[in-house]
Amino acid sequence: MNQIINDNYREFLKKLRERHLKKRKVKDKNKPIAVWMQDDIYRDFSIGKSLTIILRTEGCYYAKEGGCLMCSYLMDSSPEKITAENIINQFNYAIEKYKEKIKDLKDFSVKIFTSGSFLDDREVPKEARNYIFKKLSEFDNLKEVAIESRPEFIDEDKLNEIRKYLDVNVEIGVGIESFNEEIREKAINKGITNEQIIRAIELAKNYNIGIKAYLLIKPLFITEKEAIYDSISSANKCIELGCSRISFCPATVHKGSVMEFFFNKNQYRPPFLWSIIEILKEVKKSNPKALIMCDTSGVGSERGAHNLYNCKCNKLIKERLERFTLTQDINVLNVECECKNIWNAYIEVENKNIVPLGDERKLLL
């Protein structure tokens, strides 16, 4: 019976994904999705500039089969074949755009992302990866390199490939999301195990390569209180295992995702910013030497993490979260607003209700 349910579930996810993928538009295959430079924090806690390059690829193999319930990054992928030459051209375009600024910097880092895994040969061919690594190695002021990958692609061959060219700090971002396997599978549909994650962390250590743990704050099907506890416990576990940094990702409702399906039915609400503050404070207090970050994409919007919608504290807290990421000073998170009482009441009512609640405004209608 369980197998029948699982098969039907996967088929539903795949059809939902395919329906939205038909809306993708053909874009220039020789230009990246985006490229920008910003202030960032290095692994040694110093502040510098990072160049972020988001490559356009054919997308995450796992997402094509249905994928994670909150994700629609596959929509940024190309509906057409992307070759190694295309990816090399995208990288060169990004470097050329910022080469003059890079020359003037004492040091800088480069972050190279895709809509999936940089270490998946189907998405980024080895030829393109090696070209990128070789070109990066030519910068005397390069301090760090960051890429992303699912853990199943982190192996001896790929790590040797990296170290063949790069002797700087390297981090591989892994979407661990939660260290609770039941939550990761049923509420996220991640398709990876704790065993795979631990193996990737240990393997990377052998090459002095860090693992940056992406942790999702408030996946589907759990309450606000459960989300707070899960994020704190997951971060503590990742730090215990030796992850080089923790990057919290407050859930944002992506168009075309399963999360949006429940959001539209008012059966899901993105996390409160008060919850995020509590998570960051607790994790940093317990692990003062750990590097803790928080993504603020979507923060303050209706589809992103927010307190009372349109409350003035949303903008303030977003700024404080960004400052915390750069300074690692939990004192900047000391914020107060009357709407905090609504958050406390929401958690209390939701716990009595047992099942997760939706938007508090719609609940009062």
Curated annotation (Swiss-Prot):
Gene Ontology biological process: tRNA wobble base 5-methoxycarbonylmethyl-2-thiouridinylation
Entries under InterPro entries matching the protein: ELP3, Elp3/MiaA/NifB-like_rSAM, RaSEA, rSAM
SUPFAM superfamilies: Radical SAM enzymes (SSF102114)
Record-linked PROSITE patterns: RADICAL_SAM
Protein origin, superkingdom: Archaea
Binding, [4Fe-4S] cluster: C60, C68, C71
Signal peptide: none
Record-level GO cellular component terms: cytoplasm
Protein name in UniProt: Uncharacterized protein MJ0550
UniProt source species: Methanocaldococcus jannaschii (strain ATCC 43067 / DSM 2661 / JAL-1 / JCM 10045 / NBRC 100440)
